[in-house]
C-alpha cells in the first residue's frame, strides 16, 4: 500500500469519525458534553485539513497517485 493510499484511507476514516462526532454533538443535551464534542470536531477538522494538504503534496510529487 502506497503512502498516498494510506493517507486517503486515513482521511476517509477520520471523516467518518467526524460525522459520528457531529451526530453526537447535535443529540446531546448536556452543555459540557456538547462543548467537548465541539472541541473534538474542531480538532478533527484541523487534522482533516492537514491530511488533505499532505495528500495534495503527495499527488503533486507522484502524479500517478492522483485520483486513485
Model-derived regions: residue spans:
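Generic helix-packing signal
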Residues: 21, 29-32, 44, 48
